[in-house]
Amino acid sequence: MDLVSIRRMEKVVLTWGDRFIKRVFTDQEARICRRRPAPHAAFALRFAAKEAFSKALGLGMRRGIRWRDIEVFNDPSGKPGLRLFGVAADICREKGITGIHLSLSDDGDYGIAMVVMERGA
């Protein structure tokens, strides 16, 4: 689980701009966030999801996991999910992770993400 300040994310994006966005978010995530009525909230929620994933995995952003190895997407019904690439995907395979569930919510100045992982039997 991760809680993030939307105002803090806004300050980071305004200060660092594309340099920060290109380091943390995939091109698809950046396009989606920029189209939202509240783009800073969208960036904040995706950032929280990546942090929550790394915490649920038990490693943080170590062992070579890059921010862009974790992509937040929405299925056709709007349900959020995570798509993994590179080292993040490799570590999940090594650990036998067979399912990842993501919940996102925001209210006022804060966004929260919760990630639950399933391990195969």
Could you say what each language-model-derived stretch is?
Residues M1-A121:
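Core catalytic alpha/beta fold that binds nucleotide/phospho-ligands
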